[in-house]
Amino acid sequence: MKTCFIGLGYIGLPTAIVAADNGIEVTGVDINPHVVETINRGKIHIVEPGLEELCSRVIGKGVLKAQTNPAESDVYLIVVPTPFTGNHQPDISYVEAATRSVIPYLKAGDLYIIESTSPVGTTEKMAQLIYTERPELKDNIYIAYCPERVLPGNVIYELVHNDRVIGGIDEASTEKAVDFYSRFVKGTLHKTNTRTAEMCKLTENSSRDVQIAFANELSLICDKAGINVWELITLANKHPRVNILQPGSGVGGHCIAVDPYFITADFPLESQIIGKAREINNYKAFWCAEKTQQAIRQFELEQGCEPVVALMGLAFKPNIDDLRESPAKYIATKVMQGHNDADFLIVEPNISEHKVFKLTDYREAYEKADIVAFLVAHEEFNELPWRDDKVILDFCGVFKKKNV
């Protein structure tokens, strides 16, 4: 079975590699020549534990090759970004462009799958696009939607062991897609239709966003009330039917921080809680920036000089290199406005360089700083001792037992 993956990013590349490692002949397509060249050397351009070793293995076996154009295959998977516009409207132009790129290669009996997170009805729209361009394929190819649901940092395991939701435009398409995924997925494959499968992914991430918003709102309340929010949540979770999540500096990434807008854009009146959760989580990042700026002003008043400030973490969540929609990056940018860049030590242990921020080793930054703002709870930070001689702003629970 020949399979063509369009998009070799944080999801497309691991999925292509895992599929290849399970005996599927894979062509991976990406418009970035550097990405293609890197993969063909058995290397990867992202950070994901264990993935580079697996990539090297499948490249060495000849079951995975990367290129910039599609190849004739039996299965085509669309795994490209679906961002939103400035007014939070979903942008499916990448999905459409990827679909157009494979239309010339499609033949009767082929399977076309979208994995990209998409607004409800996207798969049907792409089916109509295919039929318009290639009318002879109507009722002669299989079309389905199957959203990814993996955790960065544990992608290889979850690609294989997580359940998957698979929805075809008809029953035959669903069965065809189930047969494909059964070749490398050990989790249960749940059958449905395309619209339900599309909504399922949006629902999963919107649910997480709402729950995180509750925790973040609690952190704001506790700050004003003089309560340790970490202790509060630990105690509240002793109730057998309560499971409050942990607050942080906001919500980022290309899933939880984005997917709720796909619902609120199409169903604005019906999604009040979802919309408000987005506002709360966005506000939390603004609040963290304000708190840090207040600490800087207070230090200047008391000490008569500008402090050295360490901003700990830029990624959107712990222990990854992904900065997409990162609240930490927003906070760092906002806090540094109007100040001398030399007074700030920016830390992100999962990347070697950044085009905007000059990076500093986390131990050096912690030692030199007067004010330390923990924006992301990277595991490296757990080894740092509490220092009474520093102003510590712990927005993500690095020192959960301290009342900070």
Model-assigned labels for residue ranges:
Residues 1-404:
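Structural/interface elements that position substrates and couple domains in central-metabolism enzymes
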